[in-house]
């Protein structure tokens, strides 16, 4: 990939270097489409076993020893109950985008990193060992029993 030369970069700055620069946009869906999609997503079925899996996953970020997963020394602050809600809704949206009317454990696993990474704070020990929230969440995903 080549970078623009100095003059081209100055043109880019002149065009884009202000906060009021509004890109041209075109409507791709209507408000009605969005509201209908939301309605469908809300109706997507989540089995009790999958709900329990979601709750266990989030609770594991707060009390991993209870689940036999060795990451407690690396978690300063686990995910809040809002993560449980976000993980459920995001898994439903994932199922919707795949044309299914039900959530699978794989839907949950597919979105877990995106939902949880900013909700799990790591300790200084974790940072010293070059571990971050993603590696900790991945260990939970790998070791937490899947229904």
Question: Model regions: which residues?
Answer:
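Conserved C-terminal "switch" segment of AAA+ ATPases
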Residues: 1-71, 97-101, 105, 126-130, ...
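C-terminal engagement/docking regions of AAA+ P-loop ATPases
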Residues: 63-147
């Amino acid at each position: 990939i080549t970078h623009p030369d100095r003059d081209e970069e100055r043109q880019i700055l002149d065009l884009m270097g202000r906060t009021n620069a509004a890109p041209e946009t075109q409507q791709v869906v209507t408000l009605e489409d969005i509201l209908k999609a939301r309605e469908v997503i809300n109706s997507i079925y989540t089995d009790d076993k999958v709900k329990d899996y979601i709750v266990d996953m989030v609770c594991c970020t707060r009390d991993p020893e209870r689940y036999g997963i060795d990451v407690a020394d690396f978690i300063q602050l686990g995910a809040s109950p809002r993560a449980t809600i976000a993980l459920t809704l995001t898994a439903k949206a994932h199922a919707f985008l795949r044309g299914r009317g039900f959530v699978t454990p794989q839907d949950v696993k597919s979105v877990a990193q995106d939902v949880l990474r900013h909700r799990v704070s790591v300790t200084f020990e974790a940072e010293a060992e070059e571990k971050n929230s993603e590696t900790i969440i991945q260990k939970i995903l790998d070791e937490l029993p899947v229904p």
